[in-house]
Amino acid sequence: VNIFIATVATLVIGVLPAWAGPLHQAAKDGDIARVTQLLDQGSDLSELDEAGEPALIIASLAGHADVVALFLDRGADIEIRNKGGLTALHAAAYAGNLEVVKRLVAEGADVNDRKNFYQMSPLHGAAEEGHTEVVAFLLTANADVEATERNGYTPLTQAGWRAHWDTAKLLMEAGAVCQKAELVGEPLYKECTKRQ
C-alpha cells in the first residue's frame, strides 16, 4: 500500500497543486529562509493543505531535516496527522529519511503509533520500502517488530512482499517470526523460513 501516494507524486513532480499554501510549498522545497519568513508572519503550523497534509509531514517526507527542526522549535505538534491519520514519523520512515526519523524520535514521536486508517506503525512503512537503516534505528528505539496493521500484516510480511531480504533478515534477527503460509502466501513463507 502506497500510504503517501498523493504527496509522493507532488514531490516527484516538483510543485504542489495551486491550492497548497505557501508554507506547504516552502516545506516541500526545503526553503528554510522562506519557511522562517512565513512563520514570522504568522503562518499556522497546524493548517492542512487541501490534500489533508500538514507542512511538517511534507517536510518530513521530503527529507528536509532543517525545516523539520525549525517547525519543531516553533512549536509544531509532533503528532499532527494527515487525513489518513499518519504522522511525520510515518512519512519520514516511509521515505527513508533517517536524519528526520532520528530527530522526530528524539523529540518524542511514538515509534509504535498505529492510530491511523491503515493501523500501520512507522516500522511498517520503512520495511515495505526496504529502508534497512531506518528499520535498524526504529528497532533500537523499541519499535514493535510484531506490530500488525489492519489486515494482520507485520513489517516482516511487508519487507518480504517487496523482496527486501536485507530488511527482512534484520527484522528476523530482532525477533520477527514468519506468519502462517495461508496469511502471507506460500512463496513468501518458504523464502522467509528458508532465510530464518
Which ranges hold each PLM region?
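Ankyrin repeat boundary/linker residues
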Residues: 49, 82, 115-116, 149, ...
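Start-of-repeat signature of ankyrin repeats
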Residues: 52, 85, 118-119, 152, ...
